[in-house]
Design a protein with these regions (language model features):
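Terminal targeting signals and extreme-terminal segments of soluble enzymes
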Residues: 2-192
Length: 192
C-alpha cells in the first residue's frame, strides 16, 4: 500500500497486488471525511423494476438476486447480501464493491451475437466465452445498506474487439442513488 496523498478531508492510496508473473491488480482509492454539505440527486429509481426484492429469482450462495428487468444492453437486478453485515460503513462499502462486479457482465454480454446460444441451448456461459473484468470503478455517493435490497441498473455502452463497457447506478429501496459503477469487460469467444 502506497500513501499518495494525506489531506485534511481526503486521503489517496495505491495498492498493487502481485503473483509470480507480475502485477495482477492496480488499485487506486480515495477516502473522504464526511461533510455536511448540499445533497442533490439527479438520477431516479427506474419505474420498470418493481418492488425491492421482486423479479425472477437467481440466488447465489452469498447473494439474493432478483432479475427486475433484462433486455439487450440492460440488466436491472435487485441484489442483497444474505448475511447481516452490521452497521459498519466500511464493511457495507466493501460488500457493495464485491457485489458490483456481477451485473456489468450481464449487460454487456446480452449484446453479444452468440448470447442466444447460451440461453436457448442451455450451454454454460463459460463454454462459449472467456471473460474477465479489465477495469472497474466505483463512486460511493451516499451511505448504503448492502444487506437490504439494492437495485443495480447497468447499461452496455458497446462491445468491440472483445471488450465491452458497462455503466450502472445503484439505488436503495428509498430511491436514493447510493453509487455509480463503470466496468470494462473482456468477453472473448472460445476458439477451442
Amino acid at each position: 500500500v502506497d500513501r499518495i496523498r494525506n489531506g485534511r478531508s481526503f486521503v489517496t492510496r495505491r495498492v498493487v497486488a502481485r503473483q509470480s508473473d507480475g502485477a495482477i491488480l492496480n488499485l487506486s482509492c480515495s477516502f473522504q471525511v464526511h461533510e455536511e454539505q448540499a445533497d442533490v440527486q439527479e438520477s431516479t429509481l427506474p419505474a420498470d423494476v418493481g418492488e425491492p426484492g421482486s423479479g425472477v429469482v437467481e440466488d447465489w450462495d452469498l447473494l439474493g438476486r432478483r432479475i427486475a428487468h433484462r433486455s439487450t444492453g440492460r440488466s436491472a437486478i435487485w441484489l442483497r447480501v444474505r448475511d447481516d453485515l452490521g452497521d459498519d460503513p466500511m464493511m457495507q462499502a466493501c460488500a457493495l464493491a464485491f457485489t458490483s462486479d456481477d451485473i456489468p457482465t450481464d449487460s454487456v454480454g446480452s449484446t453479444h451475437p452468440r448470447i442466444d446460444e447460451v440461453h436457448e441451448d442451455d450451454i454454460g456461459y463459460g463454454d462459449v466465452f472467456i471473460g474477465a473484468s479489465l477495469d472497474h470503478a466505483i463512486w460511493f455517493h451516499r451511505p448504503l445498506p448492502v444487506d437490504e435490497w439494492l437495485l443495480h441498473d447497468h447499461r452496455s455502452h458497446g462491445l468491440a474487439n472483445a471488450r465491452g463497457l458497462s455503466v450502472g447506478e445503484v439505488f436503495a429501496p428509498s430511491g436514493a442513488h447510493v453509487a455509480t459503477v463503470a466496468q470494462e469487460i473482456l468477453i472473448r469467444e472460445r476458439t477451442r
